[in-house]
Amino acid sequence: MPWIQIKLNATAENAEAIGDMLMEETGALSATFLDAQDTPVFEPMPGETRLWGDTDVIGLYDAEADMDFVLNMLKNSPLIAEDFAYKIEQLEDKDWEREWMVNFHPMRFGRRLWICPSWREAPEPNAVNVLLDPGLAFGTGTHPTTSLCLEWLDGQDLVGKTIIDFGCGSGILAIAALKLGAEKVIGIDIDPQAIQASRDNAERNGVSDKLALFLPQDQPTDVQADVVVANILAGPLRELSPVIKSLVKPGGKLAISGVLEIQAEDVSTYYSDELALDPVVARDEWCRISGYKA
């Protein structure tokens, strides 16, 4: 079925209240927020909602919604300026999952590694192929932070090594490490859906017997790894730096990403006390920080 959406501009101070009003008083099925000025996003701390100074609020309605009623409610709301601008659009229904599947293609990272959708044939059967169905979890290889980590893993000697994937998401890094020769990988994530997606993808790739998955509260307390990867965000990388550093064996390696270039210098200071850091590698405003624990 088709849908109708209304988009109007708001500020960080009133965007959430307008979204609540659209949902509670006008019958919107959802309310979402978009950056109106394409400002870089800095992640919030846990429990905090971070919105842009200039925010678009989008309300989604079914095709039968009375948009005259919606507009009248908006015009009479104290949250809305008298001369507010808005845009109403009709959206044709799509099979979004199928459309996404059509646009997810095999991708090569480094010399040996390919990430392939599970429903497509691997282009190089003799290469190191990871078959991926990310489900609801983050990590397909298309984001610069994921690709930077995959390329780094492809350049390491992982044969017989123990790896920790801190924030495993879809399991893409963990499974890539196993396909590249790692003996054992521990995947940790705060999201049960990510744990399930990692488990499913590990089974699909025939490596589930070598992948141990944990929520943070269940992870082993005395484990260290030869290689640790953490593709999360700058805030958690700062906050959890003592934990992440403690997971790296003496002589082991660490790669972290999810960091904007402009955050790299600051984030590096949280790790340079215990690791000899490599030059930062950047791509599309994001970067990878890696190093060696003496």
UniProtKB/Swiss-Prot annotation:
Protein name (database record): Ribosomal protein L11 methyltransferase
NCBIfam families, sorted: prmA
Top-level enzyme category: transferase
Superkingdom of this protein's organism: Bacteria
Catalyzed reaction equations: L-lysyl-[protein] + 3 S-adenosyl-L-methionine = N(6),N(6),N(6)-trimethyl-L-lysyl-[protein] + 3 S-adenosyl-L-homocysteine + 3 H(+)
Compartments where located: Cytoplasm
Binding site for S-adenosyl-L-methionine: 146, 167, 189, 231
GO molecular function, one term: protein-lysine N-methyltransferase activity
Function noted in UniProt: Methylates ribosomal protein L11.
UniProt keywords, alphabetically: Cytoplasm, Methyltransferase, S-adenosyl-L-methionine, Transferase
One Gene Ontology biological process: methylation
Gene it is expressed from: prmA
InterPro entries: Ribosomal_L11_MeTrfase_PrmA, Ribosomal_PrmA_MeTrfase, SAM-dependent_MTases_sf
Family the UniProt entry places it in: Belongs to the methyltransferase superfamily. PrmA family.
EC number: 2.1.1.-
Membrane listed as a keyword: no
Gene Ontology CC: one annotated term: cytosol
